[in-house]
């Protein structure tokens, strides 16, 4: 097993001669995080919803004539796991900020909960915004639009906004290919807006004041 010894480098690692990175998936419960990981890595779709506490496994992905080892970490979105969830964040290279396009609350929570939480604990990790369940989007409804996702991506300074569907097998490879590219390529990461940067600095200051994660 790969030991991530250098905290929050955001630079990937080498394991058994292959480039490796740790990817953590966060977002509200039931937005499709587990389905995303299983559909991508195993081609499976769970038949029933079972809330995740912690789950992690590795997957070898072939991309650009090279093999990459992806260490995938699934996390619980429920509030009762708020104190435990950050234990999975250490040494993360990429964080997937996930919401369901047919669940506006999950979209709003990216800005109010998930992005601030990630910046608080692992502010050097790259972030990819992922809109899941695009196969369930209905025109003329209150569903989150592609433009709204693009705008939020730019506001938060995410590497990219990608829409995906585990059931329809849309965008799955793109999510993880982009994750690899943002770590092992030299392309600059978009800068967050001034407002977002100010919030991140405030979050970092709060982190320095906290003495214990678990009580």
Swiss-Prot record:
Organism: Entamoeba histolytica (strain ATCC 30459 / HM-1:IMSS / ABRM)
Localization in the cell: Cell membrane; Cytoplasm, Cytoskeleton; Cell projection, Phagocytic cup; Cytoplasmic vesicle, Phagosome
Record keywords: Cell membrane, Cell projection, Cytoplasm, Cytoplasmic vesicle, Cytoskeleton, GTP-binding, Hydrolase, Lipoprotein, Magnesium, Membrane, Metal-binding, Methylation, Nucleotide-binding, Phagocytosis, Prenylation
Residues that coordinate or bind Mg(2+): 34, 52
Molecular function per GO: GTP binding; GTPase activity; magnesium ion binding; protein kinase binding
Motif placement: Switch 2: 74-93
Bias type Low complexity, positions: 195-204
Signal peptide residue numbers: none
UniProt remark on domains: The switch 1 and switch 2 motifs undergo large conformational changes during GTP/GDP cycle and play important roles in the interaction with downstream effectors.
Membrane topology term: Lipid-anchor
Database matches in Pfam families: Ras
Resulting phenotype, residue 120 to Q: Loss of interaction with formin1
Null allele phenotype: RNAi-mediated knockdown causes a delay in phagocytosis which fails to complete. Slight reduction in F-actin levels. Recruitment of formin1 and profilin1 to the phagocytic cup is impaired. Adhesion to host cells is reduced.
EC class (word): hydrolase
Domain of life of the organism encoding this protein: Eukaryota
Cofactor requirements of the protein: Mg(2+)
Gene3D superfamilies: P-loop containing nucleotide triphosphate hydrolases
Residues found modified as Cysteine methyl ester: 212
Name this polypeptide is given: Ras-like GTP-binding protein RHO1
